[in-house]
Amino acid sequence: MYSKGMILAAVAAFTTAVAAKTGDMTWFHPGLGACGRTDNDGSPVVALNSADYANGAHCFQWITIQANGRTTAAQVVDLCPGCGSGGIDVAPAIFDDIASLDVGRVQVNWFFQ
């Protein structure tokens, strides 16, 4: 028989997997974002592609970003109209958590927390 805890853990893992997005991550120098807040290169922030930004519906929510065996988190503060489906644009501090800034672009998985 399965325990309640095992079932809940399986449901949580499935929910996260279903909600996960895949796309290219690039970096930018933050300033005044579409959500109305000013940030800088050291801020843990992200700009979402137009579809995921959803006219600001996700402003100030946090996302988890995974790639290259690394994980980091960033707060939604801006729109990235040039990002493709699933694409995100992050502050240098966040990009550096996943890959060297010299790389410039890396494919990532990410999801809303």
Question: What is each model feature region?
Answer:
Residues 2-113:
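Secreted/periplasmic proteins
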